[in-house]
């Protein structure tokens, strides 16, 4: 699967199992919900902090018909351990073997994941994306979400 994402393009679909056992199909959000995909490099020292901060934003997104999905570049066991370090994680955390990250252009040539966030609208189109530290900042995400969800 090659890099197929970008603002204005159809979001690559996927089905994945979250660490809580729920099955997530990106298509389930079409029609009523915006999906907010956050690619999180779990080896980064700030991964736990980013998850905790994003968890607070997830509740706000939910109230505006947005579902945050965390996508981790780690095994199920590693993702479960990371999720366990964040009290009351408010969004699904999905382990990824690189397949989803590659489809969204979040996979570096060395196999590591870039910190990236994508907002997918109700029609399944990517309407916003960010890369780097700003991609994991709740304030940046909430500002962008309010803008595109009008």
Language-model regions, residue ranges each:
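Short, internal strand/loop/helix patches
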Residues: 69, 80-114
């Amino acid at each position: 699967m090659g890099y197929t994402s970008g603002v204005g393009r159809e979001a690559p679909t996927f089905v994945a199992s979250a660490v809580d056992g729920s099955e997530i199909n990106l298509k389930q959000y079409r029609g009523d919900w915006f999906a907010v995909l956050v690619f999180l490099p779990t080896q980064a020292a700030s991964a736990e902090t980013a998850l905790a901060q994003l968890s607070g934003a997830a509740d706000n997104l939910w109230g505006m018909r947005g579902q945050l999905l965390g996508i981790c570049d780690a095994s199920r066991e590693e993702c479960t351990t990371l999720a366990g370090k964040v009290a009351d994680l408010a969004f699904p955390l999905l382990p990824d073997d690189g397949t989803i990250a590659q489809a969204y252009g979040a996979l570096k040539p060395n196999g590591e994941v870039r910190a990236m966030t994508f907002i997918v609208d109700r029609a399944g189109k990517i309407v916003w994306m960010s890369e780097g530290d700003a991609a994991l900042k709740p304030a940046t995400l909430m500002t962008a979400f309010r803008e595109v969800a009008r």
